Amino acid sequence: MSGTRDGDLNAAIRTALGKVIDPELRRPITELGMVKSIDTGPDGSVHVEIYLTIAGCPKKSEITERVTRAVADVPGTSAVRVSLDVMSDEQRTELRKQLRGDTREPVIPFAQPDSLTRVYAVASGKGGVGKSTVTVNLAAAMAVRGLSIGVLDADIHGHSIPRMMGTTDRPTQVESMILPPIAHQVKVISIAQFTQGNTPVVWRGPMLHRALQQFLADVYWGDLDVLLLDLPPGTGDVAISVAQLIPNAELLVVTTPQLAAAEVAERAGSIALQTRQRIVGVVENMSGLTLPDGTTMQVFGEGGGRLVAERLSRAVGADVPLLGQIPLDPALVAAGDSGVPLVLSSPDSAIGKELHSIADGLSTRRRGLAGMSLGLDPTRR
């Protein structure tokens, strides 16, 4: 009878562990082969051994807490002890095959015909218009809705995404597969996670292309609903590489109301004419500063966002909407410096509502059927 009870308890514990999600891979630890052993005592004490992917796993404390909490909630258990071990090279190889398939060369999942991930390349003409701020806030707002979101900091020379997302974690590497850190429920990858301190990255075009290719192919993104790429300003090497590596990526153009900035933003959007990309819309940032008396000061002028949308619509022969106008507010700057996007810290503010509205519009869109395999054979009846 004791053996039966122990077997029932072990089964209940394993079921509970099946609900423990690995914080990096976002899959149950039982499915990933991370449960090494479960031992129970006659008094209900439990000893669970867990495999970590690498010895210096940055999430080992979080995994231990999740396992302990899950086992402690199982009826009939008393004291819970969790021990950690490390996967062997063979186990890591099997894990990589399980996640990525037994492919010799990594592929870019978002460029495959059957990919359902929406890819938005956030572009601007000039620097300093708030492109990265818009990117992180849209990502966080989408994640709040329960979507699986990733952000790729493609601005290699001017990287700022980790700081604005409040993460200093480094990626975990399992063989050639890179596991991106997660901040505010968003997967984040940036060259800043591979450099020391504020070291500048001094690379030319071919190196930039290779880095972008590795971020897209070697990083294990999982099943994303939306991937946001924070592009560098202008129409240089990275923008061209994105069009080559992910032809289905759609452009989101960020500008300020200033006409000079709008003209440059128009050039950044017009790259779509040469790369055959779709422009999903325009976002106007720093639209106006609300004063204490309720009036609005147009610090950077007005009309730039609408002008860009109208001119791009004429250029591409399709509607390019002005998706939103984000007010100028020091709180948005402070939120970026603190590492907590404003859509999370002040969701009910005017800026928060506008950003959430833009995110809603982008989240509810579905990828078109162009380039996708429908699994139909016209020769069969």
Swiss-Prot record:
Presence of the UniProt keyword Acetylation in the record: no
InterPro entries according to UniProt: FSCA_dom_sf (IPR034904), MIP18-like (IPR002744), Mrp-like_CS (IPR000808), Mrp/NBP35_ATP-bd (IPR019591), NUBPL-like (IPR044304), P-loop_NTPase (IPR027417), YlxH/NBP35 (IPR033756)
Organism domain of life: Bacteria
Keywords linked to the UniProt accession: ATP-binding, Hydrolase, Iron, Iron-sulfur, Metal-binding, Nucleotide-binding
GO molecular function terms noted in the UniProt entry: 4 iron, 4 sulfur cluster binding; ATP binding; ATP hydrolysis activity; ATP-dependent FeS chaperone activity; metal ion binding
A UniProt-annotated Pfam family: FeS_assembly_P
Binding site for ATP: 125-132
One Gene Ontology term from the biological process aspect of the record: iron-sulfur cluster assembly
Family listed: In the N-terminal section; belongs to the MIP18 family. In the C-terminal section; belongs to the Mrp/NBP35 ATP-binding proteins family.
Function description: Binds and transfers iron-sulfur (Fe-S) clusters to target apoproteins. Can hydrolyze ATP.
Note: Was identified as a high-confidence drug target.
Subunit and interaction comment: Homodimer.
UniProt name for this protein: Iron-sulfur cluster carrier protein
Chain's gene name: mrp
